[in-house]
Regions:
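Conserved glycine-rich Rossmann-like NAD(P)H-binding loop of the short-chain dehydrogenase/reductase
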Residues: 27-42
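A glycine-rich helix->loop->beta "capping" turn
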Residues: 71-84, 90
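Active-site helix of classical SDR
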Residues: 117, 153
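Residue(s) in the substrate-gating loop at a strand-loop-helix junction
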Residues: 137
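The beta1-alpha1 cofactor-binding region of Rossmann-like NAD(H)/NADP(H)-dependent oxidoreductases
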Residues: 57-67, 99
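Conserved glycine-rich cofactor-binding loop
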Residues: 13-14
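Substrate-binding pocket helix/loop in short-chain dehydrogenase/reductase
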Residues: 93-94, 101-103
Length: 181
């Protein structure tokens, strides 16, 4: 029986999430990896196995997120670590930004993170432990031209992380704001 912590990682088709999943699988951790494109996960990491569950998930869709979290718990029995890594950048001046694109970025970078976190928290609270890693950015602290709204999403992630850490510490749940860049 595998006693290693079960990881749920969002945004795994490339970048940080992809590298993290590779390292976790190399070390034998059970991992549920999500992407909007499940096939890309299968091509990179292989088919579903005892320690790997590739899943298509749209983090902006709350009902989709809940069904994926249920699938992960059904397969592995619990979730010990959540890495909220999914997100993207939309660059434009404040004056010229397309509001539809701006809302879509907030839906993924902020509200998607909340959807996944809110779906996983009851599981972690019930088991009296867990660790949530929210990937923000140094952009939460250092803004520049063209990146105002992206940085605003990452500042929101920072604020959510700090607040959540205080709200769930009594349940044995830790929250870390990861700031790559």
């Amino acid at each position: 029986m595998n006693t290693k912590k079960v990881w749920l990682v969002t945004g795994c088709s490339k970048g940080l999430g992809n590298s993290l999943v590779k390292k976790l699988l190399e070390k034998g951790y059970p991992v549920a990896a999500t992407s909007r494109n499940k096939q890309s996960l299968i091509e990179q990491f292989g088919e579903k196995s005892d320690v790997f569950l590739p899943v298509s998930m749209n983090i902006a869709d709350e009902s989709n997120v809940k069904s994926v979290v249920d699938e992960v718990v059904k397969k592995f029995g619990h979730i010990d670590v959540l890495v909220n890594n999914a997100g993207y950048t939309y660059l434009a001046t404040i004056e010229e930004i397309n509001m539809k694109d701006a809302r879509a970025m907030f839906d993924v970078n902020v509200f998607g993170l909340l959807n996944v976190t809110r779906a996983v928290l009851p599981i972690m609270r019930k088991q009296h432990h867990g660790h949530i890693f929210n990937v923000s950015s140094l952009g939460a602290y250092n803004v520049g031209p063209l990146s105002g709204l992206y940085c605003a999403t990452k500042h929101a992630v920072k604020a959510i992380s700090e607040t959540l850490a205080r709200e769930v510490s009594e349940f044995g749940i830790h929250v870390t704001d990861v700031k790559p860049g």
